[in-house]
Regions:
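Structured C-terminal subdomain patch of bacterial secreted/periplasmic proteins
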Residues: 238-264
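A structural signal for short, hydrophobic/glycine-enriched beta-strand patches
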Residues: 45-46, 50-236, 245
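Membrane-embedded alpha-helical segments of integral membrane proteins
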Residues: 1-29
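Extended, histidine- and acidic-residue-enriched regions that form the cofactor-binding/catalytic faces
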Residues: 15-17, 54, 262-263
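Central hydrophobic cores of alpha-helical transmembrane segments
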Residues: 38-45
């Protein structure tokens, strides 16, 4: 199922859809179907423009960032969290143009918030970093081990930083996390955790965690919204804005897909 989802998902996201729209438009124009060719071209360019500009991106981001309440370290039950669970956000393997393995930007921001929170809670709640490798053809995990190294260098005791290296997506992150917590805290049900991930990823992560029987306390990081006001430049297409819009739509596609599969 993991492989099937990986192969199907691009066909529901803007980069592939826009490419298919342009190819379809070209096919129509070559067949001299000018009216439909013009309609498809206009629609394709319009979608690209909207997703690349500030106001539409803002609506997409806020639809996710405001979907989950932030409990600021506690939940309605008042139970003490058993672990600070950080979900992986990606890492880059070293190669000819990259001298060393590196965490992605979202991973850094998630990890940093986890380290901050650990110290804010006086080191009384251990950290569990969950994430193997989500790539189809590169199964060797590097991300969790990278974060462990950074955490130990920053002064976190090795006994307080656990890692999980077998999961490949959010569903497996939560599943493997629950297995570790079941083993470490066998008498606890449900497991209360502080859940850290990117703000737009939090709604899907919380829904999966609750479905798995966990009691997550959302602690989002890596926020995308920068401002609630827009200037002239926000109405010009931006590659960064298009990327962020695509990330948001990726989350909505994931939520719908997981809902259909019964994982939420």
């Amino acid at each position: 199922m993991f492989v099937i989802l990986k192969l199907i998902k691009p066909f529901f996201l803007p980069p592939t859809l826009i490419l298919l729209g342009m190819v379809f438009c070209l096919w129509l124009l070559l067949r001299k179907r000018w009216r439909w060719g013009t309609i498809i071209l206009t629609a394709t360019l319009g979608i690209y423009y909207l997703l690349s500009t500030g106001p539409v991106n803002y609506l997409l981001v806020r639809s996710l960032e405001t979907a989950t309440p932030i409990f600021l370290g506690t939940d309605d039950s008042g139970a003490k969290p058993e672990a600070i669970v950080i979900l992986a956000g990606g890492a880059w393997r070293s190669g000819p143009t990259r001298p060393r393995d590196e965490l992605s930007g979202p991973s850094w921001r998630r990890l940093w918030r986890g380290l901050e929170l650990y110290r804010e809670r006086d080191g009384k709640i251990p950290i569990l970093y969950s994430g193997g490798n989500g790539e189809l053809f590169d199964r060797a995990p590097i991300e969790a081990n990278l974060t462990r190294g950074y955490a130990l260098t920053s002064g976190i005791p090795e006994s307080d930083f656990m890692i999980e290296t077998t999961s490949r997506n959010t569903y497996e992150n939560i599943r493997e996390t629950k297995k570790i917590l079941d083993h470490k805290f066998p008498s606890s049900d449900p497991h209360h955790i502080i859940l850290i991930t990117s703000s737009i990823h939090m709604p899907r992560a919380v829904l999966i965690a609750k479905k798995a029987g966990l009691a997550p306390i959302p602690e989002p990081a890596d926020f995308l919204v920068r401002s609630t006001s827009f200037g002239l430049l926000d109405f010009f297409p931006s590659a960064e804005t298009f990327l962020n819009s695509t990330r948001c739509l990726n989350e909505w596609v994931g939520i719908v897909a997981y809902r259909i599969m019964g994982r939420l």
